[in-house]
Amino acid sequence: MEPQNHTSASEFILLGLSEKPDHDPVLFSLFLCMYMITVVGNLLIILAISFDSHLHTPMYFFLANLSLVDFCLATNTVPKMLVNIQTRNKSISYPCCLTQMYFFHFFGIMDSVLIAVMAYDRFVAICHPLHYSTIMSPRLCGLLVGVPWVYSCFISLTHILLMARLVFCGKNELPHYFCDLTPLLRLSCTDTTVNKIFVLIVAGMVIATPFVCILASYARIIVAIMKVPSAGGRKKAFSTCSSHLSVVALFYGTTIGVYLCPSSVRTAVKEKASAVMYTAVTPMLNPFIYSLRNRDLKGALKKIINRKISTSS
């Protein structure tokens, strides 16, 4: 029997969203527009919250962090895909692949945890309005954001260290548009049991657990809203949560489908479609979801835009 060739791959080929070159111009134009909207939208949210003192509250502090994470999540994947399409060079070195994977998981975990933190913020605001400022103190807000940054760094680094021990021999084509964990594990010719177990543990910790916390928060919120005597009061209370619920549905609807569904029902096409949702579509839509229904944020955005126009003229 011939010994296997265990020379690890030095680079991978990202096959992208479509293997048909005819689709490239459309995909390039579409994702370039989406990325530009994502960058402008999220940076405007951050600037509006930073420069308007009326928005220096816990809710907007968490929103600014979410916008920063969304911007970074999209920047980690979309520009590389655009370069690959434009240059028709779809290769990525192994170190760059691991780096992209690290930041993808880092910002993805942050996104998940921040959305759960924002649900807790809404729970305190609606269920304990008189004690809101006491509970959501600057120290607690700092911890609710700072701890997830450290937590995300540790988990992402563990993923990379476990991945670095694997050997890739033979086929080096990834049926994806960025370096994601699951497609890479399929290419390994060594035992990936430890990696797969860690993926399941992390999925439970950073997807299932925050999602359960969100459901618990909104269960308490619904009970509190139902106790409000007037229909107008109930509508006003629920309107403060509607934007966040939309983001929850967008983000967790796709991530649960990718990381918690059995591998038997997952396909490369489904994985790529879900990845597009949470790396490109959701970061692009979040600024619109939060700003369209929020008068204070719309007012702050108008001030920034008007100031820019007056400065230019």
Swiss-Prot record:
It is a multi-pass membrane protein. GO terms for biological process: G protein-coupled receptor signaling pathway; sensory perception of smell. Keywords: Cell membrane, Disulfide bond, G-protein coupled receptor, Glycoprotein, Membrane, Olfaction, Receptor, Sensory transduction, Transducer, Transmembrane, Transmembrane helix. Residues 1-25, 76-97, 164-196, 266-274 are extracellular. It is found in: Cell membrane. Belongs to the G-protein coupled receptor 1 family. This is Olfactory receptor 1M1. It comes from Mus musculus (Mouse). The lineage of its organism: Eukaryota, Metazoa, Chordata, Craniata, Vertebrata. The gene is Or1m1.
